[in-house]
Swiss-Prot record:
The organism's place on the tree of life at top rank: Bacteria
Family matches, as Gene3D superfamilies: 3.30.70.860, YajQ-like, domain 2
GO cellular component labels: cytosol
Descriptive protein name: Nucleotide-binding protein Syncc9605_0652
Protein family: Belongs to the YajQ family.
Protein role: Nucleotide-binding protein.
Keyword Iron among UniProt keywords: no
Keyword field contains Nucleotide-binding: yes
Organism (species): Synechococcus sp. (strain CC9605)
GO-annotated molecular function: nucleotide binding
PANTHER family found in the cross-reference section: UPF0234 PROTEIN YAJQ
Keywords: Nucleotide-binding
Length: 165
């Protein structure tokens, strides 16, 4: 039996689910009467989405469709960081949507301090874009998971728990 147990806290999303969501959004935009002739393009790049459409009104409608479809496919809306829309050539509007993946150092430090202040029986280590929480009993780790889940709204990033050992 192991003398210590641990798990990792990460911020990640399933890229294939995002691709499927974008396919649904494109299909929905093509079928909706008010968006049919907007000539909307949604491009997925490595770390961002680029939405190009006819006007601010259609951009807002496409954002709403994106949020709805992402929620239905169990993608957290916290992965989307909507930037301010900018004008593109030909009376079109472009919006860049950054995709949040991984814990920044600032958020990892905040999470680490939060867990250390509340729970004295666990140790917290920042490992790149994840945080490892280690404890002597599984009950301590369960308490840490409940604490982190309760404080997830303060951190403004989606959190998952991996490598529970």
């Amino acid at each position: 039996m192991a003398s210590t147990y641990s798990f990792d806290v990460v911020s990640d999303f399933d890229r294939q689910e995002l691709v499927n969501t974008l396919d649904q959004v494109r299909r929905d935009v093509g079928n909706r009467y008010d968006l049919k002739d907007s000539n909307t393009e949604i491009d997925l790049e490595e770390t961002e989405l680029v939405i190009t459409t006819a006007s601010d009104m259609t951009l807002q409608a496409v954002e709403d469709v994106l949020r709805t479809k992402a929620t239905k496919r169990n993608l957290s809306l916290k992965i989307f960081d909507f930037q301010t829309p900018e004008t593109a050539g030909g009376n079109r509007v472009r919006q860049v949507v950054k995709l949040r993946k991984g814990l920044s150092q600032e958020i990892a430090k905040k999470l680490s301090k939060m867990v250390r202040d509340e729970l004295k029986k666990v140790t917290v280590a920042i490992q790149g874009e994840s945080v490892r929480i280690t404890g002597k009993s599984k009950d301590d780790l369960q308490a840490a998971i409940q604490l982190v889940k309760g404080k997830e709204d303060e951190l403004d990033v989606p959190l998952q728990f991996e490598n529970y050992r």
